[in-house]
């Protein structure tokens, strides 16, 4: 009889979130050799999108957990969401503990992952935990919390985070920098960390249409419009750059979208537009750009490769990134000549970034785009990275 794998996934298709599609790909791949069950909450991300609750796939079982959801960026609601989903996932785990051989623990960060990890330890079920963002550290970025308060918060939350990493068979991280940092700060053996880049469905990026001929330089941002995306900073810098015959297109939804739309009105900008695209439309939309943009707050991009950067590079376009200068994003963009980075949270630096690309010839921008595509195909595809996770899980199940 096939061994049974339980994937606990805080987000899952049809939600248009990177982790949702990573876990879907993982479920499909594992279902070739194992019985796979996915536990997921009602789909709610991104805000503003509408979904059907009965989404399923014939290759594996999907169980919809009727738990509290709170997609808004508000701490108490998010805590309640994480706690409720994880507790109900643990109820399922307890009821089926004698049937389950392995858990992929991708619930909500901190207390959510901790609750599930404790249940796995209690029932002696091996698990892997993936880490996309570093908590509690990222809760304290771009906030005006006094230093003494940060120390108190860290002293409470760091042990919560350390528990589910220490007790996991492997911890999947998305960059060498992240693995090094977590191993050092959590005092956990570096060999426990598995570094696997986030991937995209690279099939969607095949046979992309050629960019439309235009004298206009088109800057684009495609992704969530939330407080960590710094879309307001992009708008202000683009306005100040005042590049002739240029356009800024912003695609996505999120809790800061209305504020950003109001900012555009207040600044009197007529060359900034907003839209929303499905995941399938993203490659085509991005192929229309002259330059793709991302802007991460200080401390948010120094230890990981943003998932949207993978999508940007696969699109074969140059990238302007406002990020930490000791980050993997800078290492790739400038080391592989795929784009330009500027310091984070600095409007004047981003203004200069816009102007830099405007001063390049179209041929120079196209060459950067070719470099982007070449790097992505070598390092960021599903074929390259999914198998690393699958092989790790298979090796754990073989030992059991």
Placement of each model-derived feature along the sequence:
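N-terminal subdomain of nucleotide-sugar transferases
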Residues: 1-58, 400
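Membrane-proximal helix-turn-helix segments that form the acceptor-binding/catalytic region
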Residues: 118-122, 151-171
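Nucleotide-activated donor-binding/catalytic signature segment of Leloir-type glycosyltransferases, i.e.
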Residues: 243, 249, 258-283
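Acidic anion/phosphate-binding donor-loop and adjacent secondary structure
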Residues: 183-184, 191-195, 199-216, 230
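Nucleotide-sugar-dependent
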Residues: 229, 276-285, 292-313, 318-331
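Conserved donor-binding/catalytic core segment of Leloir-type glycosyltransferases
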Residues: 212-229, 235-238, 249
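A short, well-ordered alpha-helix in the C-terminal region of glycosyltransferases
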Residues: 356, 363-378
């Amino acid at each position: 009889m096939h061994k049974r794998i339980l994937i606990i996934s805080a987000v899952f298709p049809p939600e248009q979130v990177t982790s949702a599609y990573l876990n879907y790909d993982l479920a499909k791949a594992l279902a070739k050799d194992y019985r796979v069950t996915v536990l997921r909450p009602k789909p709610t991300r991104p805000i503003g999108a509408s979904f059907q609750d009965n989404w399923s796939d014939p290759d594996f079982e999907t169980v919809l957990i009727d738990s509290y959801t709170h997609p808004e960026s508000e701490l108490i609601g998010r805590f309640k969401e994480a706690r409720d989903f994880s507790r109900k996932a643990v109820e399922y785990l307890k009821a089926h503990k004698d049937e389950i051989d392995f858990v992929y623990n991708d619930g909500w960060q901190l207390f959510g992952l901790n609750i599930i990890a404790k249940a796995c330890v209690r029932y002696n079920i091996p698990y892997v935990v993936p880490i996309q963002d570093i908590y509690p550290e990222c809760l304290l970025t771009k906030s005006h919390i006094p230093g003494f308060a940060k120390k108190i918060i860290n002293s409470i939350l760091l042990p919560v985070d350390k528990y589910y990493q220490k007790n996991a068979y492997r911890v999947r991280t998305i960059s060498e920098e992240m693995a090094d940092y977590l191993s050092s700060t959590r005092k956990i053996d570096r060999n426990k960390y598995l570094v696997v880049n986030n991937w995209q469905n690279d099939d969607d990026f095949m046979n992309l249409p050629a960019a439309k001929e235009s004298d206009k330089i088109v800057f684009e941002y495609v992704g969530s419009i939330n407080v960590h995306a710094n879309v307001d900073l992009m708008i202000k810098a683009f306005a100040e750059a005042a590049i002739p015959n240029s356009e800024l297109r912003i695609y996505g939804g999120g809790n800061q979208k209305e504020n950003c739309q109001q900012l555009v009105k207040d600044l009197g900008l007529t060359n900034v537009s907003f839209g929303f695209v499905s995941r399938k439309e993203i490659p085509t939309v991005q192929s229309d750009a002259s330059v793709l943009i991302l802007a991460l707050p200080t401390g948010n991009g120094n230890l990981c490769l943003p998932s949207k950067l993978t999508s940007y590079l696969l699109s074969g376009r140059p990238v302007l990134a406002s990020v930490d200068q000791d980050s993997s994003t800078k290492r790739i963009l400038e080391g592989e000549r795929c784009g330009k980075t500027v310091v984070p949270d600095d409007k004047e630096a981003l203004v200069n970034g816009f102007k830099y690309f405007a001063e390049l010839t179209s041929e120079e921008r196209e060459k950067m785009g070719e470099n982007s595509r070449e790097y992505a195909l070598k390092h960021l595809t599903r074929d390259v990275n999914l198998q690393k996770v699958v092989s790790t899980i298979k090796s754990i199940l073989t030992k059991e």
